[in-house]
């Protein structure tokens, strides 16, 4: 992978292969879906299932999503070039979700520094497929798995590039001129280190598109695009990875999922006043919780605080903002955390236990790094 002078992976050079011209800012005149086709917009930062660390993409939830036969147009937000296409027919390294996959992912270059990323398209438009060579086109339209492949297909603002239906559309903006400060060690993210350049989509949409998106947005406080970077040196807040597990990429040979070594202390993507504890291996499964009493605040916890105890409870707000009625309010488990020198953390989860039943770490405690 090409490297920048600051030591970060040069994603612009990798995606565009030196063919891009110009730099941002770029103005998006179209939403990725027509506003009238969208039920809601969920911003960056959710933690759910295998997304243990705050999620690096937003969600456009189409209307009639339960009807998988209904398809909606997916649009290019601005002029550019599709530079990466991928086709997924299975989720490798995981048995968490037993569904049939047939998803398309795209990266669009809008300048030498600004890119958009799409995922979960159910099909690609003929205007895109017809610009590809026959072998690649056959592979994309078949049932075979195709890793992300570099291409160069020109698109215009508002052009239909595919369809989505029966699922959400993933969308994110990357600006390689910006570096998020809340990722202390970008190298731990490997082939996912472009997330350190994730940019708030509301900063790029033209006023009319931005206004439409704000109406659809389930988050009503700034930053409206959400947040994913929470690391603070010497503090508990942020992302952690099981020591020796390969960072964010994790263990791809673990059938339970690469995320089993992930751990995050963050804030809710819709109500950022709420503390989230997201654990990749909570009794063998990924789980995300609120904290009873909404304290202690992980942003205030450091080495001098020693072993800190969290009582974990179910969130009363769902990932798309729905309020859960009648959910258990009892404690679902306990987490112990101790910030160590050298960006290390000692951590142990106790599913089904209460604070009174946990007196300290056991031999099951593990060390995390970042």
PLM ranges: what are they?
Residues 71-74, 144-153:
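Short, surface-exposed secondary-structure edge patches
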């Amino acid at each position: 992978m090409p490297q920048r002078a600051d030591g970060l992976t040069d994603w612009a050079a990798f995606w565009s292969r030196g063919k891009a011209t110009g730099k941002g800012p770029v103005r998006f005149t179209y939403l990725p879906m027509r506003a009238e086709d969208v039920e809601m917009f969920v911003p960056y930062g959710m933690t759910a299932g295998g997304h243990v660390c705050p999620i690096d993409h937003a969600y456009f939830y189409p209307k009639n999503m339960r009807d998988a036969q209904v398809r909606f147009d997916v649009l290019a937000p601005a002029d550019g070039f599709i530079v990466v296409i991928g086709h997924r027919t299975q989720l490798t390294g995981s048995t968490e979700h037993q569904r049939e996959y047939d998803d398309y992912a795209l990266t669009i270059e809008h300048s030498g520094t600004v890119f958009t990323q799409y995922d979960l398209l159910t099909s690609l438009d003929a205007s895109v497929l017809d610009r590809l060579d026959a072998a690649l086109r056959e592979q994309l339209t078949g049932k075979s798995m195709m890793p992300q492949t570099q291409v160069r297909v020109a698109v215009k603002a508002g052009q239909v590039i595919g369809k989505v239906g029966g699922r959400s559309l993933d969308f994110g903006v990357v600006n390689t001129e910006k570096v998020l400060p809340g990722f202390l060690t970008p190298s731990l993210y490997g082939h996912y280190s472009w997330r350190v350049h994730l940019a708030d989509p509301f900063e790029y949409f033209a006023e009319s598109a931005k206004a439409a998106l704000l109406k659809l947005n389930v988050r009503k406080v700034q930053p409206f695009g959400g947040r994913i970077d929470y690391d603070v040196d010497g503090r508990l807040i942020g992302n952690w990875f099981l020591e020796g597990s390969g960072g964010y990429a994790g263990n791809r040979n673990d059938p339970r999922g690469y995320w089993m070594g992930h751990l995050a202390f963050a804030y809710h993507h819709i109500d950022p006043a709420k503390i989230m504890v997201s654990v990749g291996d909570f009794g063998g499964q990924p789980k995300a919780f609120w904290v009873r009493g909404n304290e202690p605040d992980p942003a205030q916890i450091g080495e001098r605080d020693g072993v800190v105890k969290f009582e974990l409870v179910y969130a009363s707000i769902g990932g798309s903002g729905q309020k859960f009625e009648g959910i258990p309010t009892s404690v679902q488990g306990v987490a112990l955390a101790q910030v160590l020198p050298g960006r290390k953390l000692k951590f142990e989860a106790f599913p089904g236990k209460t604070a009174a039943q946990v007196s300290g770490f056991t031999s099951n405690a593990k060390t995390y790094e970042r």
